């Protein structure tokens, strides 16, 4: 190779060294929540078509405060969240919309006393739960109001996270815990090891349907997204939607393998995750295809407390 060729090659290699973006995959960051639907995000990130063209990164937020701070700072452009959070953000002037619903309800009441089988049975009992004024609390309050149960007569103790609620429920004298999957399944397994007989007293989606005369369906949580980011990447999000649908199908057909993946992201052992998939009402449905169901759900929340939605009902254009 002559001197001119050598210098040309050196220049080309030097340019490549200082321009890694020419070779690197584009980033696709998604934040999950500390609950079972994040397993779908994990499987899709590992196995999906989008993984072939993008550098997928999944992280889990641990509390609603972290979620809100991440969205406000711009760090979280795509994140799993309770469905009302996207509406609340939009009504505060933050340009977010609801991309999909990933569970039709994964909350239940776990109990030590087998006689607790209904919301009415919680009156006079000690209940522990996470996330005051967020979705678990909202759902319980809406059900109590509809059924005429005085929630002030339930001794409720609030904690910051689902694992904390489960730990205190097992160790202290609480009669019941409002929990989400996979923590409910984890509590049952941990209870057996500790000699504490824990069972599911009742499923909140079933009580919701019974109370409001509808299907046992709570469009509880899904992905919310920065609308400008979504509009600039619609084709990418279509691929991701299909990846999530395929991930759900694979999870239900391969529960043990899915549990191994989920356990890398969620604070629950593999057996608990494997047991939780079937009773978590998992789905992957675009928000715009659930407009009527979402509006009906948000009407209940608005009647309970308009602040839960940021002061007003959502515009249907928020459902992407």
PLM regions and their residue ranges:
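Conserved C-terminal helix/tail region of periplasmic/extracytoplasmic solute-binding proteins
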Residues: 295-320
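Short, glycine-/small- and polar/acidic-enriched structural segments
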Residues: 24-150, 156-159, 175, 181, ...
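Sec/Tat-exported extracytoplasmic proteins
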Residues: 75, 80, 90, 131, ...
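Pocket-lining segment of extracytoplasmic ligand-binding domains
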Residues: 84-85, 164-261
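Short, solvent-exposed loop/beta-turn-alpha elements that line the ligand-binding surface or hinge
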Residues: 49-53, 207-216, 283-291
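N-terminal export signals
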Residues: 5-23
């Amino acid at each position: 190779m002559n001197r001119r060729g050598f210098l040309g090659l050196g220049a080309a290699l030097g340019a490549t060294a200082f321009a890694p973006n020419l070779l690197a995959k584009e980033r696709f960051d998604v934040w999950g929540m500390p609950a079972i639907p994040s397993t779908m995000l994990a499987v899709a990130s590992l196995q999906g078509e989008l993984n072939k063209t993008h550098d997928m990164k999944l992280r889990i937020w641990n509390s609603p405060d972290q979620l809100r701070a991440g969205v406000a700072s711009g760090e979280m452009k795509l994140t799993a969240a309770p469905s009302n959070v996207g509406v609340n953000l939009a009504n505060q002037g933050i340009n977010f919309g609801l991309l999909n619903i990933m569970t039709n309800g994964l909350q239940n009441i776990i109990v030590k006393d087998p006689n607790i089988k209904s919301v009415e049975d919680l009156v006079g009992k000690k209940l522990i739960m996470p996330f005051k004024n967020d979705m678990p609390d909202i759902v319980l309050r809406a059900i109590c109001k509809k059924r005429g149960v005085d929630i002030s007569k339930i001794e409720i103790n609030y904690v910051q996270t689902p694992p904390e609620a489960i730990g205190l429920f097992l160790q202290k004298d609480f009669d019941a815990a409002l929990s989400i999957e996979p923590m409910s399944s984890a509590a049952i397994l941990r209870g057996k090891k500790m000699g504490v007989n824990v069972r599911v007293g009742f499923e909140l989606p079933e009580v919701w349907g019974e109370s409001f005369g509808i299907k046992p369906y709570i469009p509880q949580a899904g992905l919310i997204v920065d609308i400008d980011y979504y509009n600039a990447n619609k084709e990418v999000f279509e691929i991701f939607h299909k990846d999530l649908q395929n991930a759900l199908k694979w999870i239900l057909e391969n529960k043990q393998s899915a549990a191994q993946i989920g356990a890398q992201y969620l604070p629950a052992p593999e057996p608990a995750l494997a047991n939780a998939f079937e009773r978590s009402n998992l789905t992957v449905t675009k928000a715009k295809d659930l407009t009527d169901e979402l509006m009906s759900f948000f009407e209940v929340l608005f009647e309970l407390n308009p602040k839960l939605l940021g002061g007003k009902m959502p515009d249907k254009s928020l459902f992407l």
